[in-house]
Protein backbone atom coordinates (compact mmCIF):
# COMPACT_ATOMS: atom_id res chain seq x y z
CA UNK A 1 0.00 0.00 0.00
CA UNK A 2 1.57 3.30 -1.11
CA UNK A 3 0.06 5.25 1.79
CA UNK A 4 1.77 6.13 5.07
CA UNK A 5 0.86 3.83 7.97
CA UNK A 6 0.96 4.25 11.73
CA UNK A 7 4.40 2.59 11.76
CA UNK A 8 5.84 5.52 9.76
CA UNK A 9 5.21 8.01 12.58
CA UNK A 10 6.96 9.18 15.72
CA UNK A 11 4.13 9.05 18.25
CA UNK A 12 5.90 9.78 21.56
CA UNK A 13 4.14 12.50 23.52
CA UNK A 14 1.80 13.30 20.62
CA UNK A 15 -1.97 13.66 20.71
CA UNK A 16 -2.97 11.17 18.01
CA UNK A 17 -6.45 11.36 16.47
CA UNK A 18 -7.75 7.91 15.51
CA UNK A 19 -10.89 7.03 13.52
CA UNK A 20 -12.00 3.56 14.59
CA UNK A 21 -15.15 1.62 13.73
CA UNK A 22 -16.98 0.93 16.99
CA UNK A 23 -20.37 0.67 15.27
CA UNK A 24 -21.32 -2.40 17.31
CA UNK A 25 -24.78 -3.92 17.86
CA UNK A 26 -26.35 -3.00 21.20
CA UNK A 27 -29.38 -4.54 22.90
CA UNK A 28 -30.69 -2.72 25.98
CA UNK A 29 -27.31 -1.02 26.40
CA UNK A 30 -25.38 -4.30 26.16
CA UNK A 31 -22.95 -4.97 23.29
CA UNK A 32 -24.00 -8.22 21.57
CA UNK A 33 -20.94 -8.53 19.28
CA UNK A 34 -17.68 -6.71 20.07
CA UNK A 35 -15.60 -7.98 17.11
CA UNK A 36 -15.11 -4.45 15.79
CA UNK A 37 -13.67 -3.29 19.11
CA UNK A 38 -11.25 -6.24 19.13
CA UNK A 39 -10.28 -5.48 15.52
CA UNK A 40 -9.11 -1.96 16.49
CA UNK A 41 -6.92 -3.12 19.40
CA UNK A 42 -3.63 -3.64 17.50
CA UNK A 43 -3.59 -0.01 16.32
CA UNK A 44 -4.66 1.46 19.67
CA UNK A 45 -2.11 -0.66 21.55
CA UNK A 46 0.66 0.29 19.12
CA UNK A 47 -0.06 4.01 19.65
CA UNK A 48 -0.10 3.87 23.45
CA UNK A 49 2.86 1.49 23.68
CA UNK A 50 4.86 4.01 21.63
CA UNK A 51 3.98 6.86 23.99
CA UNK A 52 1.13 8.37 21.99
CA UNK A 53 -2.03 9.81 23.51
CA UNK A 54 -4.90 8.16 21.63
CA UNK A 55 -8.03 10.23 20.93
CA UNK A 56 -10.62 7.92 19.38
CA UNK A 57 -13.55 8.84 17.12
CA UNK A 58 -16.39 6.52 16.03
CA UNK A 59 -20.02 6.61 15.03
CA UNK A 60 -22.69 4.27 16.38
CA UNK A 61 -25.89 3.70 14.44
CA UNK A 62 -27.85 6.46 12.70
CA UNK A 63 -28.72 9.66 14.53
CA UNK A 64 -31.00 12.15 12.78
CA UNK A 65 -32.84 13.85 15.64
CA UNK A 66 -32.50 14.30 19.41
CA UNK A 67 -34.71 11.25 20.15
CA UNK A 68 -32.31 9.02 18.18
CA UNK A 69 -29.55 9.63 20.75
CA UNK A 70 -31.30 7.22 23.11
CA UNK A 71 -29.21 4.05 23.29
CA UNK A 72 -26.57 5.41 20.87
CA UNK A 73 -23.98 6.67 23.34
CA UNK A 74 -20.50 5.15 23.14
CA UNK A 75 -20.41 4.79 26.96
CA UNK A 76 -20.81 0.95 26.85
CA UNK A 77 -18.02 0.85 24.23
CA UNK A 78 -15.68 2.85 26.49
CA UNK A 79 -16.31 0.32 29.27
CA UNK A 80 -15.73 -2.69 26.96
CA UNK A 81 -12.55 -1.14 25.52
CA UNK A 82 -11.19 -0.37 29.00
CA UNK A 83 -11.62 -4.04 29.95
CA UNK A 84 -9.84 -5.18 26.79
CA UNK A 85 -6.94 -2.75 27.23
CA UNK A 86 -6.68 -3.27 30.99
CA UNK A 87 -6.63 0.50 31.58
CA UNK A 88 -8.99 3.44 31.93
CA UNK A 89 -10.62 4.86 28.80
CA UNK A 90 -11.47 8.50 29.46
CA UNK A 91 -14.98 9.28 28.20
CA UNK A 92 -16.07 12.92 28.56
CA UNK A 93 -19.36 12.11 26.76
CA UNK A 94 -19.26 14.94 24.23
CA UNK A 95 -18.24 15.59 20.62
CA UNK A 96 -17.02 19.17 21.21
CA UNK A 97 -16.69 21.86 23.86
CA UNK A 98 -14.57 23.01 26.80
CA UNK A 99 -14.93 19.82 28.84
CA UNK A 100 -13.72 17.62 25.96
CA UNK A 101 -10.84 19.99 25.17
CA UNK A 102 -9.74 20.08 28.83
CA UNK A 103 -9.80 16.27 29.05
CA UNK A 104 -7.68 16.01 25.88
CA UNK A 105 -5.18 18.61 27.16
CA UNK A 106 -4.86 16.66 30.42
CA UNK A 107 -3.96 13.39 28.65
CA UNK A 108 -0.64 11.78 29.50
CA UNK A 109 1.49 9.51 27.31
CA UNK A 110 -0.15 6.09 26.85
CA UNK A 111 -3.65 7.23 27.81
CA UNK A 112 -6.80 6.69 25.76
CA UNK A 113 -9.79 9.01 25.34
CA UNK A 114 -12.99 8.23 23.44
CA UNK A 115 -15.02 11.08 21.93
CA UNK A 116 -18.82 10.63 22.00
CA UNK A 117 -20.67 9.24 18.93
CA UNK A 118 -19.63 11.39 15.94
CA UNK A 119 -23.14 11.11 14.47
CA UNK A 120 -24.52 13.17 17.38
CA UNK A 121 -23.24 15.99 15.14
CA UNK A 122 -25.82 14.94 12.50
CA UNK A 123 -28.74 16.30 14.54
CA UNK A 124 -27.97 19.88 13.52
CA UNK A 125 -27.66 19.65 9.74
CA UNK A 126 -25.82 16.34 9.22
CA UNK A 127 -22.43 17.91 9.96
CA UNK A 128 -20.66 14.54 10.32
CA UNK A 129 -22.30 12.72 7.40
CA UNK A 130 -22.03 15.68 5.02
CA UNK A 131 -18.38 16.33 5.92
CA UNK A 132 -18.99 19.84 7.27
CA UNK A 133 -15.66 21.68 6.75
CA UNK A 134 -15.81 23.51 10.10
CA UNK A 135 -16.39 20.26 12.02
CA UNK A 136 -13.48 18.49 10.29
CA UNK A 137 -11.25 21.47 11.06
CA UNK A 138 -12.39 21.58 14.71
CA UNK A 139 -11.79 17.87 15.31
CA UNK A 140 -8.38 18.11 13.60
CA UNK A 141 -7.49 20.99 15.98
CA UNK A 142 -7.86 18.63 18.97
CA UNK A 143 -4.70 16.78 17.92
CA UNK A 144 -1.21 17.66 16.80
CA UNK A 145 -1.28 17.13 13.05
CA UNK A 146 -1.46 13.32 13.12
CA UNK A 147 -4.54 11.31 12.12
CA UNK A 148 -4.76 7.51 11.94
CA UNK A 149 -7.68 6.06 10.00
CA UNK A 150 -8.40 2.50 11.11
CA UNK A 151 -12.11 2.44 10.22
CA UNK A 152 -12.44 0.32 7.10
CA UNK A 153 -16.20 0.09 7.70
CA UNK A 154 -16.60 3.80 6.84
CA UNK A 155 -13.75 4.12 4.30
CA UNK A 156 -16.33 4.37 1.49
CA UNK A 157 -17.95 7.40 3.17
CA UNK A 158 -16.90 11.04 2.93
CA UNK A 159 -17.50 12.11 6.54
CA UNK A 160 -16.02 14.80 8.77
CA UNK A 161 -14.45 12.20 11.08
CA UNK A 162 -12.41 10.57 8.31
CA UNK A 163 -12.02 12.68 5.15
CA UNK A 164 -12.67 15.98 7.02
CA UNK A 165 -9.96 15.41 9.63
CA UNK A 166 -7.55 14.06 6.97
CA UNK A 167 -7.81 17.33 5.02
CA UNK A 168 -6.76 19.37 8.05
CA UNK A 169 -3.73 17.48 9.36
CA UNK A 170 -0.12 17.24 8.26
CA UNK A 171 -0.13 13.43 8.16
CA UNK A 172 -3.15 11.16 7.67
CA UNK A 173 -2.11 7.50 7.83
CA UNK A 174 -3.61 3.99 7.82
CA UNK A 175 -3.95 1.87 10.94
CA UNK A 176 -3.21 -1.87 10.91
CA UNK A 177 -6.81 -2.96 10.31
CA UNK A 178 -7.30 -0.62 7.36
CA UNK A 179 -3.94 -1.71 5.94
CA UNK A 180 -4.86 -5.42 6.23
CA UNK A 181 -8.34 -4.95 4.78
CA UNK A 182 -6.97 -3.20 1.70
CA UNK A 183 -4.14 -5.71 1.31
CA UNK A 184 -6.39 -8.78 1.50
CA UNK A 185 -9.30 -7.57 -0.61
CA UNK A 186 -7.42 -5.50 -3.17
CA UNK A 187 -4.74 -8.15 -3.72
CA UNK A 188 -7.37 -10.86 -4.04
CA UNK A 189 -9.08 -8.95 -6.82
CA UNK A 190 -6.11 -7.25 -8.52
CA UNK A 191 -3.42 -9.94 -8.25
CA UNK A 192 -5.06 -13.22 -7.20
CA UNK A 193 -3.40 -16.59 -7.11
CA UNK A 194 -5.47 -18.61 -9.58
CA UNK A 195 -7.91 -20.26 -9.93
CA UNK A 196 -9.82 -17.28 -8.46
CA UNK A 197 -13.49 -17.99 -7.64
CA UNK A 198 -15.95 -15.33 -6.47
CA UNK A 199 -19.18 -16.28 -4.73
CA UNK A 200 -21.98 -13.73 -4.54
CA UNK A 201 -25.21 -14.21 -2.62
CA UNK A 202 -27.77 -11.97 -1.01
CA UNK A 203 -31.20 -10.93 -2.16
CA UNK A 204 -30.72 -8.18 -4.75
CA UNK A 205 -29.02 -8.10 -8.12
CA UNK A 206 -29.22 -4.29 -7.96
CA UNK A 207 -26.81 -4.22 -4.99
CA UNK A 208 -24.23 -6.29 -6.83
CA UNK A 209 -24.33 -5.23 -10.52
CA UNK A 210 -21.01 -3.36 -10.36
CA UNK A 211 -19.40 -6.14 -8.34
CA UNK A 212 -20.55 -8.86 -10.76
CA UNK A 213 -19.31 -6.86 -13.76
CA UNK A 214 -15.90 -6.24 -12.19
CA UNK A 215 -15.49 -9.83 -10.99
CA UNK A 216 -16.52 -11.31 -14.35
CA UNK A 217 -13.41 -9.58 -15.73
CA UNK A 218 -11.12 -10.58 -12.86
CA UNK A 219 -12.29 -14.00 -11.62
CA UNK A 220 -12.15 -17.41 -13.30
CA UNK A 221 -15.66 -18.26 -12.06
CA UNK A 222 -18.47 -16.30 -10.41
CA UNK A 223 -20.99 -18.39 -8.47
CA UNK A 224 -24.40 -16.84 -7.78
CA UNK A 225 -26.70 -17.82 -4.90
CA UNK A 226 -29.24 -16.25 -2.56
CA UNK A 227 -32.41 -14.40 -3.55
CA UNK A 228 -30.86 -12.81 -6.63
CA UNK A 229 -30.77 -16.27 -8.25
CA UNK A 230 -34.46 -15.87 -9.14
CA UNK A 231 -33.99 -12.63 -11.07
CA UNK A 232 -31.40 -14.48 -13.19
CA UNK A 233 -33.82 -17.44 -13.57
CA UNK A 234 -36.74 -15.27 -14.68
CA UNK A 235 -34.47 -13.46 -17.16
CA UNK A 236 -34.06 -16.87 -18.85
CA UNK A 237 -37.76 -17.69 -18.74
CA UNK A 238 -37.48 -20.17 -15.83
CA UNK A 239 -40.55 -20.37 -13.53
CA UNK A 240 -39.81 -18.87 -10.09
CA UNK A 241 -43.19 -19.20 -8.31
CA UNK A 242 -43.45 -16.50 -5.62
CA UNK A 243 -39.67 -16.10 -5.26
CA UNK A 244 -38.07 -12.72 -4.85
CA UNK A 245 -37.49 -11.04 -8.21
CA UNK A 246 -36.40 -7.58 -9.28
CA UNK A 247 -38.57 -7.11 -12.36
CA UNK A 248 -36.74 -3.90 -13.33
CA UNK A 249 -33.40 -5.74 -13.40
CA UNK A 250 -34.32 -8.61 -15.76
CA UNK A 251 -32.55 -6.97 -18.71
CA UNK A 252 -29.42 -6.41 -16.60
CA UNK A 253 -29.43 -10.05 -15.47
CA UNK A 254 -29.87 -11.21 -19.07
CA UNK A 255 -27.02 -9.03 -20.30
CA UNK A 256 -24.69 -10.23 -17.49
CA UNK A 257 -25.43 -13.85 -18.44
CA UNK A 258 -24.81 -13.15 -22.12
CA UNK A 259 -21.44 -11.49 -21.61
CA UNK A 260 -20.21 -13.87 -18.91
CA UNK A 261 -18.69 -16.40 -21.36
CA UNK A 262 -19.86 -19.24 -19.12
CA UNK A 263 -18.07 -17.81 -16.05
CA UNK A 264 -21.37 -17.09 -14.28
CA UNK A 265 -22.58 -20.25 -12.54
CA UNK A 266 -26.14 -20.41 -11.20
CA UNK A 267 -27.76 -22.91 -8.80
CA UNK A 268 -29.48 -25.92 -10.41
CA UNK A 269 -32.07 -26.49 -7.66
CA UNK A 270 -33.60 -24.73 -4.65
CA UNK A 271 -35.05 -25.45 -1.25
CA UNK A 272 -38.54 -23.98 -1.47
CA UNK A 273 -41.34 -23.24 1.01
CA UNK A 274 -44.99 -22.26 0.63
CA UNK A 275 -44.45 -19.05 2.65
CA UNK A 276 -41.52 -16.97 3.90
CA UNK A 277 -42.36 -17.19 7.60
CA UNK A 278 -45.41 -19.27 8.52
CA UNK A 279 -44.79 -22.03 6.01
CA UNK A 280 -46.32 -25.48 6.31
CA UNK A 281 -44.33 -27.21 3.58
CA UNK A 282 -40.61 -27.23 2.69
CA UNK A 283 -39.18 -29.28 -0.18
CA UNK A 284 -36.38 -29.40 -2.73
CA UNK A 285 -37.20 -28.50 -6.34
CA UNK A 286 -36.68 -31.10 -9.08
CA UNK A 287 -34.57 -28.70 -11.13
CA UNK A 288 -34.25 -24.95 -11.47
CA UNK A 289 -37.98 -24.14 -11.64
CA UNK A 290 -39.74 -23.19 -8.41
CA UNK A 291 -43.27 -24.57 -7.98
CA UNK A 292 -46.33 -22.32 -8.20
CA UNK A 293 -47.28 -21.01 -4.74
CA UNK A 294 -43.74 -21.63 -3.41
CA UNK A 295 -40.66 -19.45 -3.05
CA UNK A 296 -36.99 -20.40 -3.15
CA UNK A 297 -35.26 -19.69 0.18
CA UNK A 298 -31.94 -21.56 -0.20
CA UNK A 299 -29.89 -23.36 -2.82
CA UNK A 300 -30.58 -27.11 -2.99
CA UNK A 301 -28.30 -30.17 -2.56
CA UNK A 302 -27.46 -30.47 -6.28
CA UNK A 303 -26.37 -26.83 -6.29
CA UNK A 304 -24.19 -27.37 -3.21
CA UNK A 305 -22.51 -30.28 -5.04
CA UNK A 306 -22.12 -28.17 -8.20
CA UNK A 307 -20.56 -25.27 -6.27
CA UNK A 308 -18.30 -27.70 -4.38
CA UNK A 309 -17.04 -28.97 -7.74
CA UNK A 310 -16.58 -25.40 -9.07
CA UNK A 311 -14.48 -24.56 -6.00
CA UNK A 312 -12.20 -27.60 -6.32
CA UNK A 313 -8.58 -26.49 -6.57
CA UNK A 314 -9.38 -22.79 -6.01
CA UNK A 315 -6.45 -20.79 -4.62
CA UNK A 316 -8.30 -17.49 -4.03
CA UNK A 317 -11.95 -17.25 -3.00
CA UNK A 318 -13.89 -14.08 -2.25
CA UNK A 319 -17.36 -14.61 -0.79
CA UNK A 320 -19.99 -11.92 -0.29
CA UNK A 321 -23.59 -12.75 0.57
CA UNK A 322 -25.28 -15.87 1.96
CA UNK A 323 -26.82 -18.60 -0.23
CA UNK A 324 -30.19 -18.50 1.51
CA UNK A 325 -32.09 -17.30 4.58
CA UNK A 326 -29.34 -18.66 6.83
CA UNK A 327 -30.86 -17.17 10.02
CA UNK A 328 -33.50 -19.91 9.74
CA UNK A 329 -32.13 -23.45 10.39
CA UNK A 330 -34.39 -24.79 7.59
CA UNK A 331 -32.54 -22.68 5.02
CA UNK A 332 -28.91 -22.61 6.13
CA UNK A 333 -27.62 -25.79 4.45
CA UNK A 334 -26.60 -23.93 1.29
CA UNK A 335 -24.54 -21.36 3.16
CA UNK A 336 -22.93 -24.05 5.35
CA UNK A 337 -22.24 -26.26 2.32
CA UNK A 338 -20.53 -23.46 0.42
CA UNK A 339 -18.49 -22.37 3.46
CA UNK A 340 -17.29 -25.93 3.98
CA UNK A 341 -16.44 -26.27 0.28
CA UNK A 342 -14.33 -23.09 0.47
CA UNK A 343 -12.33 -23.85 3.60
CA UNK A 344 -11.46 -27.45 2.66
CA UNK A 345 -9.44 -26.34 -0.40
CA UNK A 346 -5.73 -26.86 0.34
CA UNK A 347 -3.75 -23.61 0.61
CA UNK A 348 -6.72 -21.43 -0.31
CA UNK A 349 -6.76 -17.71 0.48
CA UNK A 350 -10.38 -17.27 1.58
CA UNK A 351 -11.89 -13.85 2.14
CA UNK A 352 -15.35 -12.90 3.40
CA UNK A 353 -16.53 -9.46 2.34
CA UNK A 354 -18.23 -8.42 5.57
CA UNK A 355 -21.95 -7.96 6.18
CA UNK A 356 -24.29 -10.97 6.27
CA UNK A 357 -21.61 -13.42 5.12
CA UNK A 358 -19.44 -12.49 8.11
CA UNK A 359 -22.45 -12.92 10.42
CA UNK A 360 -23.15 -16.32 8.82
CA UNK A 361 -19.55 -17.51 9.31
CA UNK A 362 -19.56 -16.36 12.94
CA UNK A 363 -23.05 -17.69 13.81
CA UNK A 364 -22.48 -21.02 12.07
CA UNK A 365 -19.08 -21.59 13.70
CA UNK A 366 -16.82 -21.32 10.63
CA UNK A 367 -15.19 -17.90 11.21
CA UNK A 368 -11.79 -19.19 12.33
CA UNK A 369 -11.40 -21.27 9.16
CA UNK A 370 -11.24 -18.23 6.82
CA UNK A 371 -8.07 -16.30 5.97
CA UNK A 372 -9.76 -12.93 6.42
CA UNK A 373 -13.19 -11.65 7.41
CA UNK A 374 -13.74 -8.04 6.47
CA UNK A 375 -15.17 -5.62 9.03
CA UNK A 376 -16.87 -3.47 6.39
CA UNK A 377 -19.72 -4.67 4.19
CA UNK A 378 -20.27 -1.53 2.11
CA UNK A 379 -16.57 -0.66 1.89
CA UNK A 380 -15.55 -4.16 0.82
CA UNK A 381 -18.32 -4.15 -1.82
CA UNK A 382 -16.93 -0.93 -3.30
CA UNK A 383 -13.41 -2.40 -3.36
CA UNK A 384 -14.78 -5.51 -5.10
CA UNK A 385 -16.41 -3.16 -7.58
CA UNK A 386 -12.99 -1.66 -8.31
CA UNK A 387 -13.87 1.75 -6.84
CA UNK A 388 -11.52 4.04 -4.93
CA UNK A 389 -12.54 4.59 -1.31
CA UNK A 390 -12.65 8.28 -0.21
CA UNK A 391 -11.31 7.47 3.28
CA UNK A 392 -8.31 5.76 1.71
CA UNK A 393 -7.76 8.36 -1.03
CA UNK A 394 -7.54 11.06 1.68
CA UNK A 395 -4.48 9.45 3.32
CA UNK A 396 -0.94 10.79 2.86
CA UNK A 397 1.18 9.14 0.17
CA UNK A 398 4.48 7.53 1.20
UniProtKB/Swiss-Prot annotation:
Substrate binds at residues 21-23, 36, 59-62, 119, 157. It comes from the Bacteria. Keywords: ATP-binding, Cytoplasm, Glycolysis, Kinase, Nucleotide-binding, Transferase. It catalyses: (2R)-3-phosphoglycerate + ATP = (2R)-3-phospho-glyceroyl phosphate + ADP. One of its GO terms (molecular function) is phosphoglycerate kinase activity. One of its GO terms (cellular component) is cytosol. The keyword rRNA-binding does not apply. Its EC number is 2.7.2.3. Pfam families: PGK. Pathway: Carbohydrate degradation; glycolysis; pyruvate from D-glyceraldehyde 3-phosphate: step 2/5. GO terms for biological process: gluconeogenesis; glycolytic process. Belongs to the phosphoglycerate kinase family. PANTHER family: PHOSPHOGLYCERATE KINASE, PHOSPHOGLYCERATE KINASE 1, CHLOROPLASTIC-RELATED. This is Phosphoglycerate kinase.
